């Protein structure tokens, strides 16, 4: 669980397009944190618990979706206020 923010550690082995999104349990997009090419290496992405319009999200379960090329990785996170 996290409050008020969480970090996502990402390591890439080569320069690649990366998309990191937060979605709710219904699969609706909450926020896009990264949507561009990143150099190879270690990257830290933070989510502050806000949606795309800057509104604070309620406590609950969310999913971090990390897409790199044709790969998609999803991880569950819990926001507690």
Where are these regions (language model features)?
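C-terminal outer-membrane/trafficking sorting elements
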Residues: 2-81
């Amino acid at each position: 669980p996290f409050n008020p923010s969480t970090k996502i550690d990402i390591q890439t082995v080569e320069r690649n397009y990366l998309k990191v999104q937060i979605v709710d349990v219904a699969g609706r997009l909450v926020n896009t944190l990264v949507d561009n090419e990143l150099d190879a290496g270690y990257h830290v992405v933070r989510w502050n618990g806000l949606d795309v319009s800057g509104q604070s999200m309620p406590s609950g379960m969310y999913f971090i979706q990390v897409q790199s090329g044709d790969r998609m990785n999803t991880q569950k996170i819990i926001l507690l206020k």
